[in-house]
């Protein structure tokens, strides 16, 4: 008899987005001609930047010539891409990050789950509530939790509520924790963290010898010059933080797949006996064993993001989506909703009307407006009573969707 990983059986009924898909498909079976507009899953809609496409076409041609053909690449990523990332995304902002500390991957979603491979099972883990579900589910799969209660909260995790009262930025834990997930700009709430707030987290982590997992997948959407783009802009962060980044949303790579993780050399964890161990070495070992690297063609496309043309085209994409976010905020406010986010992030977080439950409001929006959002309750118990809308869609669809909402609710 082959035994399964019983931790998977602790997972709640279904990952959030498959459950949304199930409800939408059920609706479409009953209403096949409904003009549905999807503002739920944060998938991009606009084409890859021309600079990236041109670089990838050139790379494909190189793969057709024996003299320039590439086989297996370095597991950590090609040096020319890592050097561009280090220079443009970190050193240009005063961050002391070297190319050797950057690991290219096929997605930050993968990395935020895979990073657990190098950490032990006895760590006390803190997540915000609401939270990107992957952080919680991967810890459940790894056996780091007990069972979930009726609110969907897993025993063994420390939940840090983020609410309108604390501006959707969690207060520091009242107890020592070892691993802390932070996401800014935040998914799902669209909130950002000030320099002072991030400094408090770094100080806490250093005091308790904890590690911050800092997900900066949406940093390109920050419009406020006072808001840090990287945790490494904060003094002391090299001693306590791992940062995750992605090309998915800023450059439209959701279907192309390229991201990176930063693990500073000198960042340490410890063994049960108390010996210090460098995390960079463990992650490098993990990646070289379990990962063969991102394709040469895709990495050339990612490199083009940092060209002069690529930078201009990425800014154009980001500006396009942020204008969508502005329109969503404006129209929802006009319709009488309490609205958050959408200023430094491509997500708008709205309070459901009249105390309606998140899934009830999801269904009402679907059936009344033919608009798909993401129920806040799917991100955690503290997300109940909210719904997330994504700015990732065409301008035409965003305008039409908001007109429907205003007509239905204003």
Curated annotation (Swiss-Prot):
> What single Pfam family name could you report for this chain, choosing any that match?
Aminotran_1_2
Single GO biological process annotation from the record? lysine biosynthetic process via diaminopimelate, diaminopimelate-aminotransferase pathway
Keywords assigned: Aminotransferase, Pyridoxal phosphate, Transferase
- At the top level, the lineage of the source is Bacteria
Q: Please indicate if the UniProt record lists Ribonucleoprotein as a keyword.
A: no
Q: In which pathway does it act?
A: Amino-acid biosynthesis; L-lysine biosynthesis via DAP pathway; LL-2,6-diaminopimelate from (S)-tetrahydrodipicolinate (aminotransferase route): step 1/1
Share what the entry says about its subunit structure, partners included: Homodimer.
Q: Which InterPro entries match?
A: Aminotransferase_I/II_large, DapL/ALD1, PyrdxlP-dep_Trfase, PyrdxlP-dep_Trfase_major, PyrdxlP-dep_Trfase_small
| Residues annotated to bind pyridoxal 5'-phosphate | 72, 108-109, 132, 187, 218, 246-248, 257, 292
Q: Which reaction does it catalyse?
A: (2S,6S)-2,6-diaminopimelate + 2-oxoglutarate = (S)-2,3,4,5-tetrahydrodipicolinate + L-glutamate + H2O + H(+)
Q: Name one GO molecular function term.
A: pyridoxal phosphate binding
Give cofactor(s), names only.
pyridoxal 5'-phosphate
Positions binding substrate in this chain are 15, 42, 109, 132, 187, 292, 388
Task performed by this protein: Involved in the synthesis of meso-diaminopimelate (m-DAP or DL-DAP), required for both lysine and peptidoglycan biosynthesis. Catalyzes the direct conversion of tetrahydrodipicolinate to LL-diaminopimelate.
- What are the N6-(pyridoxal phosphate)lysine sites (modified residues) in this protein? 249
| Protein name stated in the entry | LL-diaminopimelate aminotransferase
> What CDD domains does its record include?
AAT_like
Q: Under which EC number(s) is this enzyme classified? A: 2.6.1.83
Does the keyword section mention Transferase?
A: yes
Family (UniProt): Belongs to the class-I pyridoxal-phosphate-dependent aminotransferase family. LL-diaminopimelate aminotransferase subfamily.
Q: What class of enzyme is it?
A: transferase
NCBIfam families from the xrefs? Answer: DAPAT_plant
